[in-house]
Amino acid sequence: LHRAGKLGLGSATLAAIRYAVAHDYDVIVTMDADWSHDPAHLSALVAATEQADVAIGSRYVEGGAIESWPQHRRLLSRAMNRLSRTMLQLPIHDTSGAYRAYRVAKLREINLDEIRAVGYAYLEEILWHLAQGDAIFAEVPITFHQRRAGRSKVSLREAAGKLATLVRLAWRPDRRQR
């Protein structure tokens, strides 16, 4: 799968998901390509999809960890995850982690065209849509490593977009109460 230019994490991931759906894959795995996600956790994530529709590599469950982040970044990440979990009523501790394994059969059940976030807010939005479809979630503890390549793309614009997405989804009139 090759795309010209950078169109955002959500856009890239949705293109990969559409490809997996069209080609009848069983499972699709997403992960960061900067070495912050250790491939050693891959088999545990895929194995978790035998019992769950979505397996999330989680920094925030027992056994999970973050390596080499300053305290303020850890606190901000935890606070944003708690806000997302509360506003969207998600049964997940790490809503913003991108290391995931999805059962393609469950992805096929949601309307991918309804997902509007193109940046990092996509991570919470797809979980919300899956939760609305009664997806079963599992969290697999991982250690998140400081990236070895590239720079963070998180910006004030991304943060504002995430908040706007949370508000849009939390107050959707067709939202199912949990």
Model-identified regions with their sequence ranges:
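Conserved Rossmann-like nucleotide-binding pocket used by diverse enzymes
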Residues: L1, V29-M31, A55
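Acceptor/aglycone-binding surface of glycosyltransferases and processive sugar-polymer synthases
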Residues: R3-A22, P39-Y120, R147-R157, G161-L163
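Cofactor-binding loops of NAD(P)H-dependent oxidoreductases
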Residues: R3-G5, M31-A33, V140
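Short beta-strand-to-loop acidic/aromatic patch adjacent to the donor-nucleotide binding site
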Residues: Y25-S36
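Conserved residues at the C-terminal ends of beta-strands
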Residues: M31, S58, T143
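An aromatic- and histidine-rich active-site surface loop
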Residues: W35, A44, E124-E125
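Terminal low-complexity segments of carbohydrate-biosynthetic enzymes
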Residues: A40, E50, A105-K106, Q132-D134, ...
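Catalytic donor-sugar/metal-binding loop of nucleotide-sugar-dependent glycosyltransferases
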Residues: L90-P91, E114-R116, L127-F144
